[in-house]
Amino acid sequence: KNVITTAKMAAEKSKKTVVVLDTKTMLDGYYFLKNKDTDIDELKEAASRNYSVEITKAVRDTKIEDLSIEKDDFIGLVNGKIKYAKKSLKEVADAILDDLVTKNTITAVVVSGNEKDEASQKSIEEKLAGLKTANINGNQENYYYYLYIENKDPNMPEIAILTDSVSDLTDEDIEGLPIKVVPLRIDINGELYKDGVEISKSEFWHQMLDNNARIKTSQPSPQDFLNAYNKLFEKGYKKIISIHPSSKLSGTIQAAKVGRSLTNRENDIELIDSLGASLLQGFLVLGAAGKSVRGESFTEIINWVNNFRTKGKLLMIIPDLKYLEKGGRIGKASSTIAGALNMKPILTVNQGEVTVEKKVLGERNAQKYIEKYIERESKKQSIVLMSGWGGTPTELENVVRIYSEVENNPKINSLILNREIGAVIGAHAGPVYGVFIFPRLS
């Protein structure tokens, strides 16, 4: 306790953000260190479901609540409190594991002391059979065993959804949902950052537009995906649906495929090419996660994603083509001619490939084209609209303007508005804005 109090005092004096975790046992600390990359609040909540057990011997007769303890009894402490007392080491270990290991238990850690006996050791092995168990020969004195029993959330769904930062999902989007986001890497003037983790969207745009930084992107490594898949299985998920940007736009899904092949559970991981990116990809992920929470099956969710990914229409305006030219997406001549004529291409995604929907003169005419397209589609059926932007306040103002022209249409329902588009799209396209629409019935 004195150590924790001192640590908290030191944390208050630090200029950096420091979180002091009030652990009760050694294996509490082990659990937090093992999961050090997990969100702190999420980790604290998960730890509250776990049991840290210490088995030792009583040094005197005593009584704790309704538990009578005699000297030399074997006692079991659970999360720092004495809960069990038996005459043999095997008996106390059996009683503890019979009570604490349930259908929600996913992993266990067993640290054996130098006075363990064969009977208790064999019994512990039998009772933990079928669980992922880490056995450590600690050779500690006085404590026969340290046990750590990790449990999943009893209300968690069986299916997790994994994606990457191209989805442009926020922490608020995924809160409470079975979603894991693997960040791509952003190279800014030779310095690598994890997208959305070590660099925010606003900082990326500042570096690109204000500092004229040299920016490149790279997909996660197969090891990144292997680690993410294993983490989800360790949490207790039985299946994973992994949704990523179009293979014609990024090599991310190929890295995920290699990562999947390195697991021993390939049949439990379904890889899906979203045939798009950003707004479309993010919506597929949110939709799939919602279906998982509602208890829909692995096959049902996969079929929905595969069917829906071709239902929508993405329309994006790129005000300045120089970024596409710098990235080699278009030639310098095309960029120069388009600039001289004030030509504004409206881009879409068709079967996973970026194509030109329409070329118009002037940015306002490009906006009007999108507005008319939305109105035309709404006459056929009710539609849902999402909008996004990236770059400067001008792009935000323009996408707000597009929506303001159609928002009073009773057949148009908004879902996500003014979503900021991040580094992966922005690094190649520069400032950008537009909409994604799809039939409401889908």
Regions found by a protein language model. Give the residues of each.
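N-terminal glycine-rich anion-binding loop in soluble enzyme alpha/beta folds
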Residues: 160-221
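Structural motif
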Residues: 107, 160, 239-241
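Glycine-rich phosphate- or other oxyanion-binding loops that anchor nucleotides, phosphorylated ligands
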Residues: 212-213, 219-242, 246-258, 298, ...
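Mixed-charge interfacial surface used for oligomerization/domain docking
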Residues: 6, 10, 23-123, 136-139, ...
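Conserved GHKL (Bergerat-fold) ATPase module
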Residues: 1, 8-20
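Short catalytic-loop micro-motif centered on adjacent basic/acidic residues
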Residues: 161-162, 216, 242, 271, ...
